[in-house]
Each structure stands twice: as C-alpha cells, then as structure tokens.
C-alpha cells in the first residue's frame, strides 16, 4: 500500500518493539529498524528498555507511555515509506516535552510526501504548506498558517483562543505576528 496512518490512539501488536516497527516492512533489516527509530526519536527510550528492540510488548503496548507508543507508530510509518500519510490527532493528549519529540519526528516523516493532518492542537499544523479549515463539514478557509492569521477568520480565532488557554507551545506563539491583536467576539 502507498498509504500510511499515524493515529491518536496507537495500536501495538503482541511481539517485540522491533516487530512493531517492522510490521509494514517484514523484511526490514535491523539497521533499517534502528534508523527508523532514530528518526522517530524513539531509539534512546528503546535502548533503555530491558531488552532494547527485543523487549516484548503485549497487544496495546500497555507497558509503554502514550508518547513512546506514538514514536513507535511514527517509526513504523517511516519504515513503510508511504507516498500518502494521514496523521489523525498524532500529538493529542501528550505533554509538551513529548509533543516536541514527536513534532520533530513528524517533520522528518512528512518531508517529500502528501500528508493529510487532522488536528485540534493547531501548533502541530503551523509548518504545513496548505491548511484547510472546516466549519460544519465545509471548507471555510484555506491558506498557509501566516495567511490564515492575516485573514483573521475562523483559524485566527481558534489560534488566539488556544494561545489564551495556554494550549499553544511557546515556540508556536513566537511565530504569531506581533501586529495582530487578539480577535474580538
């Protein structure tokens, strides 16, 4: 298949960490698995596990944190190397430090491929080439992060609301134009 998916709720299969990363590419060499894990910022935590890449995880990966499971899913997508990638809330429900690791991994993963990213945490979308804003199931706005902020429409209001709530990481706030005051109403 030419399509890869990284979901908010990552599913891991019963087997080893290596098996889970290589799932979409069963003939992957150890070097390929390790390289994918490094790119996904997963290698270091994997090496801290009792048996490294040979550590067994049960179905669902309950012994791993959400961020660790997410990075394994990203490594799985990297090794699969799809032409089209779907990211469905890939950074939701993560702490800021883990989100940064996953953001860095996702930047590498989306490079040179068509990516459809679904997100409520708007900071995850700021580097997209093109954003589509849906309102009641219809495209209400489209453009780059900067263009949508300048238009002061729905996207702008959502970004401002997240900024006020503290839901936007500091590095994303720095990219907001200083000349744009918060939206009214």
Residue ranges and their predicted role:
Residues 150-184:
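C-terminal boundary and immediately downstream tail of ABC-type ATPase nucleotide-binding domains
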Residues 46:
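Nucleotide-activated donor-binding/catalytic signature segment of Leloir-type glycosyltransferases, i.e.
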Residues 1-9, 17-22, 27, 31-42, ...:
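ABC-family ATPase nucleotide-binding domain "signature/switch" substructure
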């Amino acid at each position: 298949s030419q399509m890869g998916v990284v979901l908010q709720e990552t599913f891991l299969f019963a087997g080893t960490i290596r098996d889970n990363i290589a799932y979409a590419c069963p003939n992957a060499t150890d070097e390929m698995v390790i390289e994918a894990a490094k790119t996904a910022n997963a290698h270091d935590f994997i090496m801290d596990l009792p048996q490294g890449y040979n550590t067994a995880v049960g179905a669902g990966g309950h012994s791993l944190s959400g961020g660790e499971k997410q990075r394994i899913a990203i490594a799985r997508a990297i090794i699969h190397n799809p032409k089209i990638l779907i990211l469905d809330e890939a950074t939701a429900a993560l702490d800021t430090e883990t989100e940064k690791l996953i953001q860095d991994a996702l930047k590498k993963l989306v490079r040179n491929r068509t990516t459809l990213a679904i997100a409520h945490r708007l900071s995850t979308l700021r580097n997209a080439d093109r954003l589509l804003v849906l309102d009641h199931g219809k495209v209400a706005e489209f453009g780059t992060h900067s263009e949508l902020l300048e238009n002061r429409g729905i996207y702008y209001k959502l970004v401002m609301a997240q900024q006020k709530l503290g839901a936007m990481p500091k590095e994303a706030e720095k990219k907001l134009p200083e000349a744009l005051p918060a939206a009214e109403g």
